[in-house]
Each structure stands twice: as C-alpha cells, then as structure tokens.
C-alpha cells in the first residue's frame, strides 16, 4: 500500500462525521455528539471517540461503566462532575475519567461546555 493511500485512510472530513443530537443517559437538554471515530475504526480497543457540546443547563445523566471506562478532556466552558461522591467543578484543560463508578457531567457555566470523550474497552 502506498503512503498516499495510508494518509487518505487516516483522514475523516468534517462532513463525514456522524452527528447525533438528543438527551444522553437520561440527562437534561439536547446534547450534540460528533462521533469522530467509532465502531470498527477503533479496532475494538474503544467504543467511541466523540466531541460533545452541552448547552447551558444541560447534562449527561448519571451512569456507570462496568466493562469499559470513559475519559473526558474539557475544551471549553465550565461544568460539574460527580467525583467519588463529591460534586466538583471542571473547566478547559481538565481531564475526567471514570472507571467502575457512577458519574455525570453538567454544564454549570454561561456558555456551551465542549469536551472530547472516549469510551475505552477494558
């Protein structure tokens, strides 16, 4: 396979992304998910790599991962997460990861909360 063919297979254009809008895990509001890499593209190492945009007052509902874990990287905005039973503020540059624990994330700021999320298989 040529180098050119390899490079083409590594790029996914914005108009090729799957975009899903709606509530997540029983949370509040309409959340936008851009599925950056999904399914077979992840070679069964992870379930999804996505960019989420959570409007002011919206949230991803309380949920737990038992056969995988979830990592968030906050790009912009402010939020609240459940961390070992305690509600903690997060913002741009923070990393949140949840393994075998219940968690949620809520936009607590005055602008969209935008973050990258990956669900990794154990």
Regions found by a protein language model. Give the residues of each.
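Conserved short histidine dyad/triad with adjacent acidic residue
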Residues: 37-39, 50-66, 100
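Short histidine-centered beta-strand/loop micro-motifs
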Residues: 44, 60-65, 106-108
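Short acidic-glycine-tyrosine-enriched beta hairpin
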Residues: 85-100
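Glycine- and acidic-residue-biased ligand/ion/polar-headgroup-sensing regions
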Residues: 67-80
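A short, N-terminal "cap"/entry segment at the start of jelly-roll beta-barrel domains
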Residues: 1-46
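Ligand-binding loop in jelly-roll beta-barrel domains
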Residues: 68, 100-122
